Swiss-Prot record:
Protein name: Alanine--tRNA ligase
Superkingdom of source: Bacteria
Principal subcellular localisation of the protein: cytoplasm
Biological role stated in the UniProt entry: Catalyzes the attachment of alanine to tRNA(Ala) in a two-step reaction: alanine is first activated by ATP to form Ala-AMP and then transferred to the acceptor end of tRNA(Ala). Also edits incorrectly charged Ser-tRNA(Ala) and Gly-tRNA(Ala) via its editing domain.
Pfam families: DHHA1, tRNA-synt_2c, tRNA_SAD
Gene that specifies this protein: alaS
Catalytic activity: tRNA(Ala) + L-alanine + ATP = L-alanyl-tRNA(Ala) + AMP + diphosphate
EC number(s) per entry: 6.1.1.7
Organism, as annotated: Shigella boydii serotype 4 (strain Sb227)
PANTHER family named in the record: ALANINE--TRNA LIGASE, CYTOPLASMIC, ALANYL-TRNA SYNTHETASE
Statement: the UniProt record of this protein carries the keyword Metal-binding: yes
Amino acid sequence: MSKSTAEIRQAFLDFFHSKGHQVVASSSLVPHNDPTLLFTNAGMNQFKDVFLGLDKRNYSRATTSQRCVRAGGKHNDLENVGYTARHHTFFEMLGNFSFGDYFKHDAIQFAWELLTSEKWFALPKERLWVTVYESDDEAYEIWEKEVGIPRERIIRIGDNKGAPYASDNFWQMGDTGPCGPCTEIFYDHGDHIWGGPPGSPEEDGDRYIEIWNIVFMQFNRQADGTMEPLPKPSVDTGMGLERIAAVLQHVNSNYDIDLFRTLIQAVAKVTGATDLSNKSLRVIADHIRSCAFLIADGVMPSNENRGYVLRRIIRRAVRHGNMLGAKETFFYKLVGPLIDVMGSAGEDLKRQQAQVEQVLKTEEEQFARTLERGLALLDEELAKLSGDTLDGETAFRLYDTYGFPVDLTADVCRERNIKVDEAGFEAAMEEQRRRAREASGFGADYNAMIRVDSASEFKGYDHLELNGKVTALFVDGKAVDAINAGQEAVVVLDQTPFYAESGGQVGDKGELKDANFSFAVEDTQKYGQAIGHIGKLAAGSLKVGDAVQADVDEARRARIRLNHSATHLMHAALRQVLGTHVSQKGSLVNDKVLRFDFSHNEAMKPEEIRAVEDLVNAQIRRNLPIETNIMDLEAAKAKGAMALFGEKYDERVRVLSMGDFSTELCGGTHASRTGDIGLFRIISESGTAAGVRRIEAVTGEGAITTVHADSDRLSEVAHLLKGDSNNLADKVRSVLERTRQLEKELQQLKEQAAAQESANLSSKAIDVNGVKLLVSELSGVEPKMLRTMVDDLKNQLGSTIIVLATVAEGKVSLIAGVSKDVTDRVKAGELIGMVAQQVGGKGGGRPDMAQAGGTDAAALPAALASVKGWVSAKLQ
């Protein structure tokens, strides 16, 4: 009996654990502090800084089953998903890693043992082929002489992509970053399937399938293409779980493995589909995996960056559901079956199931409102098409008006053998994309990519000032030996009391100084294991090796500490008041305010906001001790400690507890006791994305300032109403009631005046071929009264055509009324359109009543004068 996908995943991890590897949990699909990546797309992403020598772990061997998404940027598989046997937006990458420990020999031997040993995967040795980089003689000899693979099944692959190192067997994560030669292992499905070995003209067939890529990490590729040797040669391997499952379960398509068969059946059930071979089922089964896990990792549908990629995938799935005949929202119903089939890999998703389902349901409902109209428009345009390409302007209109991502439009067109002018689409979107780029958080400044080989010791928990030594200086991202007065720079010290931005808490400000210089620190950031002090040298000069006194801005740090501790209390309070589905989606803690984004599907009610405030202030009054303990990550999680969204943790973590009320993993700075916070007040609650709410709050002196401001406003209002704060509500109700009464009386007077004006106007009507025509410009009449006047005049005049106009604040308001017995010859909409066009406006309406506006008041007399001739021509 073949292994299930879940069993294969576990067997891989167990094998490498038996070889001394640390089993490391999958990292988030949102890369941590890596502006070069849209999504985690390989197992090694979370170890990138380790390969670069910027981060250190307490293990030198690791193994993971990493969740990955490839649907945007360089690694974009979206258009092929559902149409091929092996393309996915979401997949799991099984991997083993060596950080300066073993290298080529052991990496190859481990792979061969796992694949061929009867105890593990037991694949037939004669079915396995390998490739090596053309010049990698060492790997070739290991495969031939130690493993024993015949020469005819070992293939050298050179630079086959038109540039040095551009090869299927020279791996690189992106345009920059860790890279090196690799050896790939292929499985031969047999001669009953078309295809040839790698490197042959028939290599794109499905007979020989790559199942494992073993990268020998030796270089760090720079932006200019140069290769810098990594500190220690390392190993990075990747084996797609879905691919190896297909091999071990004796099927040729990933969509035929147990995991996808189960999901496809679930899709068929919720959509009502009966043909299980329909490719739309495969598309949806794939897309629920990427969408659910992206949302669980904090990505929300939007029109920018990661959120837009998520929206594209959701809408593609919804459109395929529509093709299958789904009559109601269905996509969110697949989260439960997905959790079941993912086994232990779905535990994080299960904790957020309700939140993920709600986000998917809301997004599907929003798109469903425009999907049918958009598809109808696309059908119309395709029916009119004379060539084989849909113009970019139409594709953009579908995106802008109906929310159709261009790849969804391309999907529909491809089914009819029609191409989309994507260049034209991009041109139409250029201005919007420019604005999106300006608003985007992607693309870090030059400081973000600084490489610092040294480490800094943070001593800011216990000290706000201490002496340190300059170990590195950077100007414009480049290392320098010295800086002079007036220069902006990043200063790295061997030890520092300055807190570097992390976990939502901003970096410290302060001063680095001695008798000969003063450096104003405006921000503090992490660079690998180093802490960089960002600022400007105000006076003197500074060089590497100098001793400095580092002084943190104590008052600012104190305010930050209060806000950070209050954030923890508020997080716990939100979970008590709203439910345990609340999880942190982002935060900002500075010296003025705390901002907290969290998962919740609706605006908080006033009583809920008050309950959270009261609960936090109750903990402040309890004056609970705020304690920190260092412990193993797993022990901390077992204790119930909550982890912060988007943060990466070491195996040993800092656990912050506030009595029995709050326990979280946190490396930030905090008050000593909750009583230090003094007072907590929520100043705003709003939505930031589907299923995400944001609270801003203040503490201590900031909270007291808001209390005083509220009191001052109440006093001012009481003074204006000639009352006092004790009876202010009664006073306001009285004023509002009096205002309503006066507005009612005023409206009655306006209606009486309009009726009188209508009576006066009726005598000015002229006869045109048996129909009374009345055209008039009125002064001092509100635009909204024109309709009432037209109704009155139609009742008085019988068979009639009426055009009234008024000008207010330079804007023209027009209305046309036509009695129903005349609408077969004169339509109010056409008449008003003719007049509006002459005054720089447009409008429309029913055949018997239409309204319009305009901007050219000077042209109004001539426009009204043209009505008689236009009507006469229509009535002949």
